[in-house]
Amino acid sequence: MTGPIVYVQNADGIFFKLAEGKGTNDAVIHLANQDQGVRVLGAEEFPVQGEVVKIASLMGFIKLKLNRYAIIANTVEETGRFNGHVFYRVLQHSIVSTKFNSRIDSEEAEYIKLLELHLKNSTFYFSYTYDLTNSLQRNEKVGPAASWKTADERFFWNHYLTEDLRNFAHQDPRIDSFIQPVIYGYAKTVDAVLNATPIVLGLITRRSIFRAGTRYFRRGVDKDGNVGNFNETEQILLAENPESEKIHVFSFLQTRGSVPIYWAEINNLKYKPNLVLGENSLDATKKHFDQQKELYGDNYLVNLVNQKGHELPVKEGYESVVHALNDPKIHYVYFDFHHECRKMQWHRVKLLIDHLEKLGLSNEDFFHKVIDSNGNTVEIVNEQHSVVRTNCMDCLDRTNVVQSVLAQWVLQKEFESADVVATGSTWEDNAPLLTSYQNLWADNADAVSVAYSGTGALKTDFTRTGKRTRLGAFNDFLNSASRYYQNNWTDGPRQDSYDLFLGGFRPHTASIKSPFPDRRPVYIQLIPMIICAALTVLGATIFFPKDRFTSSKNLLYFAGASIVLALSTKFMFKNGIQFVNWPKLVDVGFLVVHQTHDKEQQFKGLKYAQSPKFSKPDPLKRD
């Protein structure tokens, strides 16, 4: 069991120990400011001088180019309680250097900015007494005590940061209490009453550490079978039936993840990037589904991408590999979301359930156990032996709607199994509970979307209210515009922050040359500045003319600035790939970088181009 921690920072480094009331565990963790790194000391070596700071959790340690740092969760807020366990969301973080008041160079400062960016944008959750990385069903199999040793590595977000601590813990079990697995996603519960039965309804979403990243920089599958934007979402329910004196606990798992083939959308400043497909991905796809079958059993694949236009090649590529696998445990269904739900008839998504039932999916396939008043398991009534894996292009907006509808369908059967709702009645008649349910799923949708796309989810008006509205459509327009800006100009650093935090890039083992300087040709770097200058001149001639706007001098400036603006903008969009803010730490896989030279073979800069391993679908059918 873990708990709050205190630390002292001085000239010798940072010293950590458990807060008071933790029994006989007197271990002190010392993150030294020299090459010794992490050490385990006795209680007598905890500093008696210096400010003692109490924190919620130690997320772990990271070594950058020059120094080591502790990543700390300072403050938290409670987001839920379930069967006696409290869920917390991290509110405030700190990055503490081992070198007290030390100066750092510009490269080290950039790495620290990336860490701060990741901590600022992320939603981290944990529980001192419950393992949030595992589902209720998996936790039942590994035992009641929360421990990093049984945590699911896929969702152990600070797995890399705790590497030193985990190595020590293999020899010294006292260190276990310092290792707090954290998930990135969503975790919240709400209390309600349904037909005089007290219930707790909750939602937990866990983002995978493998192939993690942003919308356009982590698509498809990698050679190890990991896919972009993979999330496991668990709907949990506790119902205390006063008549039978039984406490029922339920769990229903769903997954989402990018289409498991080699594909990408290459940003080029256009609203729809260039869609490209990679080489034969059958082996990687097989690895992905072999993993999913081992973890979840039968997989029901719900594909929501459009069947024409820009998205068609992805649909066809997915169906091709599923057909080639010919696996009896893989059940594929295509649902034309935009056609079936056209004109905002989003209730028609329930037609998908009919398709899934014909393939063999049952709303009785969930985990169900009975516990006593102390929270101990009395009986395992049922286990979940399959999973619905949903995807659209981004695995965000359409996917959110479908997952919430499926979970609503299963929740009805869970209430019936606990004798809370009679067969033939519906729990949706309870308006406060329905509102809580819809808000849980809408907030979850936003959390998943912000992590991947940088904005809240689209279509959450349907998830939140059960119907599509014009205001919701307008909010979707604003979010889409924000996504366009972020995906082209701010997601590069955000992807770098993922790769740095998760250990995909380790500065202390990297080359001497800093990855951060802009090495594009000078004229490429100047174009945005020229556009800004032209816009400034245009604004001045319109709003602050020296004489009147139609004076010859003013019109000359206006015409000149307009020509410069038009030519510069045309050049920029024609060569859009050169102006995207690409990640700098880890290769995205679908790009190659070329060195350019002048006639004297002097280096002029770096240019980006599409990798020859990827090609544009031909022909690409359009609307």
Swiss-Prot record:
<dbReference type="GO" id="GO:0004438">
    <property type="term" value="F:phosphatidylinositol-3-phosphate phosphatase activity"/>
</dbReference>
<dbReference type="GO" id="GO:0005739">
    <property type="term" value="C:mitochondrion"/>
</dbReference>
<comment type="function">
    <text>Phosphoinositide phosphatase which catalyzes the hydrolysis of phosphatidylinositol 3-phosphate (PtdIns(3)P) and phosphatidylinositol 4-phosphate (PtdIns(4)P). Has low activity towards phosphatidylinositol-3,5-bisphosphate (PtdIns(3,5)P2). May be involved in the coordination of the activities of the secretory pathway and the actin cytoskeleton.</text>
</comment>
<dbReference type="GO" id="GO:0005783">
    <property type="term" value="C:endoplasmic reticulum"/>
</dbReference>
<protein>
    <recommendedName>
        <fullName>Phosphatidylinositol-3-phosphatase SAC1</fullName>
        <ecNumber>3.1.3.64</ecNumber>
    </recommendedName>
</protein>
<keyword id="KW-0832">Ubl conjugation</keyword>
<dbReference type="GO" id="GO:0032541">
    <property type="term" value="C:cortical endoplasmic reticulum"/>
</dbReference>
<keyword id="KW-0333">Golgi apparatus</keyword>
<keyword id="KW-1133">Transmembrane helix</keyword>
<dbReference type="InterPro" id="IPR002013">
    <property type="entry name" value="SAC_dom"/>
</dbReference>
<feature type="transmembrane region" description="Helical">
    <location>
        <begin position="553"/>
        <end position="573"/>
    </location>
</feature>
<dbReference type="GO" id="GO:0043812">
    <property type="term" value="F:phosphatidylinositol-4-phosphate phosphatase activity"/>
</dbReference>
<keyword id="KW-0812">Transmembrane</keyword>
<dbReference type="GO" id="GO:0017059">
    <property type="term" value="C:serine palmitoyltransferase complex"/>
</dbReference>
<keyword id="KW-0378">Hydrolase</keyword>
<dbReference type="GO" id="GO:0072517">
    <property type="term" value="C:host cell viral assembly compartment"/>
</dbReference>
<feature type="domain" description="SAC">
    <location>
        <begin position="115"/>
        <end position="454"/>
    </location>
</feature>
<feature type="cross-link" description="Glycyl lysine isopeptide (Lys-Gly) (interchain with G-Cter in ubiquitin)">
    <location>
        <position position="358"/>
    </location>
</feature>
<dbReference type="GO" id="GO:0000139">
    <property type="term" value="C:Golgi membrane"/>
</dbReference>
<dbReference type="GO" id="GO:0061909">
    <property type="term" value="P:autophagosome-lysosome fusion"/>
</dbReference>
<dbReference type="GO" id="GO:0090156">
    <property type="term" value="P:intracellular sphingolipid homeostasis"/>
</dbReference>
<keyword id="KW-0472">Membrane</keyword>
<dbReference type="Pfam" id="PF02383">
    <property type="entry name" value="Syja_N"/>
</dbReference>
<feature type="transmembrane region" description="Helical">
    <location>
        <begin position="524"/>
        <end position="544"/>
    </location>
</feature>
<feature type="topological domain" description="Lumenal">
    <location>
        <begin position="545"/>
        <end position="552"/>
    </location>
</feature>
<feature type="topological domain" description="Cytoplasmic">
    <location>
        <begin position="574"/>
        <end position="623"/>
    </location>
</feature>
<dbReference type="GO" id="GO:0005797">
    <property type="term" value="C:Golgi medial cisterna"/>
</dbReference>
<feature type="cross-link" description="Glycyl lysine isopeptide (Lys-Gly) (interchain with G-Cter in ubiquitin)">
    <location>
        <position position="246"/>
    </location>
</feature>
<keyword id="KW-0256">Endoplasmic reticulum</keyword>
<dbReference type="GO" id="GO:0046856">
    <property type="term" value="P:phosphatidylinositol dephosphorylation"/>
</dbReference>
<comment type="subunit">
    <text>Component of the SPOTS complex, at least composed of LCB1/2 (LCB1 and/or LCB2), ORM1/2 (ORM1 and/or ORM2), SAC1 and TSC3.</text>
</comment>
<feature type="topological domain" description="Cytoplasmic">
    <location>
        <begin position="1"/>
        <end position="523"/>
    </location>
</feature>
<keyword id="KW-1017">Isopeptide bond</keyword>
<dbReference type="GO" id="GO:0005789">
    <property type="term" value="C:endoplasmic reticulum membrane"/>
</dbReference>
<dbReference type="GO" id="GO:0052629">
    <property type="term" value="F:phosphatidylinositol-3,5-bisphosphate 3-phosphatase activity"/>
</dbReference>
<dbReference type="GO" id="GO:0005741">
    <property type="term" value="C:mitochondrial outer membrane"/>
</dbReference>
